[in-house]
């Protein structure tokens, strides 16, 4: 693991830092984090003033426990300097790193820059953010100074991206992956959570992914079953969503509204699905289903079994032979072939 921390230039006082059931007394919160997290590498962001004031003291405390990397940064007094800090942090992180970010000290804009940098690095360098920690000196009480774990707030950026994809395209597979990862992470860190672990989130996430696959691959016959399964899994997971995945709570109604109409395979449902495909710009799926729907409609109109393969083949031949070139069938076939 790689710890990224900023050294401030202000006054440091000995305090007892408290994180869950762990405590550590020190003047430097970085020392507590190194003691708890045991990072192989610790990157310390240093302004010139911080180097002059505290660097030697901090270095002596850390050097026997972790490899120290000095990262000189400007004071952050201009937009150009803030971009320079962003670049410095990005350069300090390697492809695939697992990182912990300490935002206790430094300039006031550090938390914002940290979150944006993390979002960038997760996408570009595939880093894994293990922790974002803040030693809340202002919240000190008789038990010590609490350390807040702000990691879930960085995950908001992932939820934002997944929600945008769902809203724009109807694809909820990214949401499904995030939900499943929450349960996986909880079980990997079960010592911290005890017996209070999510048990329905993973099935809900898998059901979301299954519906998305059926929609995007136009597996229309599978949709009623997969959508009904999703609705059931959503009900089972609703309480856990509120506790473990708060960003998803606001989307639950939208998910149900988007997919619930596809719980049967009637012709009216398929017509609604064609409109859904067009609305979300899935033109190929829309035209493919529209062509099948025209066949189904004519068979249904004549009182024949529109699910029978033999009947469908015969109707397709009739439509192809008898309808005029400017007919709906012809237009759909032309667009589909394009």
Regions found by a protein language model. Name each.
Residues 99-116, 331:
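Elongated alpha-helical scaffolds
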Residues 1-98, 119-338:
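Long, low-complexity, Lys/Arg-enriched
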């Amino acid at each position: 693991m790689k710890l990224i921390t900023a050294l401030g230039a202000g006054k440091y006082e000995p305090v007892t830092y408290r994180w869950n059931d762990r405590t550590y007394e020190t003047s430097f919160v970085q020392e507590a984090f190194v003691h708890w997290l045991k990072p192989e590498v610790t990157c310390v962001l240093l302004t010139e003033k911080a180097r002059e004031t505290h660097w030697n003291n901090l270095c002596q405390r850390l050097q026997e426990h972790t490899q120290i990397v000095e990262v000189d940064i400007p004071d952050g007094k201009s937009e150009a300097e803030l971009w320079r800090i962003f670049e410095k942090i990005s350069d300090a992180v390697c492809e695939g790193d697992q990182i912990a970010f300490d935002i206790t000290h430094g300039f006031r804009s550090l938390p914002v820059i940290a979150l944006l940098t993390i979002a960038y690095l997760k996408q570009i360098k595939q880093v894994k953010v293990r922790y974002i920690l803040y030693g809340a000196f202002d919240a000190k009480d008789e038990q010590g100074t609490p350390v807040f774990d702000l990691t879930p707030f960085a995950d908001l950026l992932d939820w934002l991206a997944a929600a945008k994809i769902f809203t724009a395209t109807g694809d909820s597979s990214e949401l499904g992956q995030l939900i499943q990862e929450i349960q996986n992470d909880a079980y990997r860190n079960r010592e911290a959570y005890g017996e209070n672990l999510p048990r329905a989130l993973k099935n809900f996430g898998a059901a979301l992914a299954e519906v998305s696959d059926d929609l995007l691959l136009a597996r229309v016959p599978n949709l009623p079953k997969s959508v009904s399964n999703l609705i059931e899994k959503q009900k089972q997971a609703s309480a856990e969503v509120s506790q473990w995945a708060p960003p998803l709570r606001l989307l639950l109604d939208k998910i149900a509204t988007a997919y619930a109409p596809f719980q049967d395979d009637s012709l009216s449902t398929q017509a609604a699905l064609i409109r859904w495909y067009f609305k979300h710009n899935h033109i190929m799926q829309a035209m493919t289903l529209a062509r099948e729907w025209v066949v189904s409609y004519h068979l249904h109109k004549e009182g024949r079994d529109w699910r029978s393969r033999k009947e469908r083949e015969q109707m397709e031949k009739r439509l192809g032979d008898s309808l005029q070139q400017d007919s709906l069938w012809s237009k759909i076939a032309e667009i589909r072939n394009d």
